[in-house]
Regions:
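A short beta-loop-alpha structural element at the N-terminal edge
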Residues: 2-16
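Acetyl-CoA-dependent GNAT
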Residues: 8, 33-90, 101-102, 107, ...
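Conserved GNAT acetyl-CoA-binding A-motif
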Residues: 108-120
Length: 172
């Protein structure tokens, strides 16, 4: 398995992985999978910001992907990112997610970001919560019943981790 930056040729496989999670899971609260063109636009938006967009590759197949995006658009949040991570169902529970998340955190820390937020759709998503705990995240709050998918209301779990970034306080 190798972790590397996303290239355009990866996007069809990423779109299929994400579509699976949209249609069968609560990790994303979208109801309809985005098109390949939309996935391409989203990935390019992350890359244009200079943020990592990583894929895990096993035998030339994409096993999963992870990327960081700004937590909020306002300037006061500029040192905080949100992670997103999705695995191909055939590659879950093999440690790939943890390796992807750890590499994402390392790269974001080296870029000077201080904090990473995980917004986990559904408090019953124990696998994602455990994954983030293993990577050093701690739960900081739960918003109850704020989402709706598959005929039920869903909680959103917020987790936070400090990144490997300098401890100095930046000037405005």
């Amino acid at each position: 398995m190798k972790i590397r930056p996303l290239v355009a040729e990866d996007l069809p496989q990423l779109q299929q992985i994400y579509a699976h999670h949209v249609l069968h899971g609560t990790g994303s609260w979208e109801w309809e999978p985005p098109s390949l063109a939309e996935m391409t636009d989203r990935a390019q938006a992350v890359q244009k910001k200079g943020l990592p967009y990583l894929v895990a590759e096993v035998a030339e197949q994409i096993a999963g992907y992870a990327y960081a995006s700004p937590y909020r658009p306002r300037a006061g949040y500029r040192f905080t990112l949100e992670d997103s991570i999705y695995l191909h169902p055939e590659f879950s529970k093999q440690g790939i997610g943890l390796l992807l998340l750890q590499e994402l955190m390392l790269q974001c820390g080296s870029l000077g970001y201080r904090e990473m937020i995980a917004v986990i759709g559904d408090s019953a998503n124990h696998a994602s919560i455990r994954l983030h705990e293993r990577a050093g995240f701690v739960e900081v709050g739960v918003f109850r019943n704020i989402g709706f998918k598959f005929g039920r209301f869903l909680d959103s779990v917020y987790m936070q981790a400090q990144l490997n970034a300098p401890a100095s306080t930046p000037s405005n």
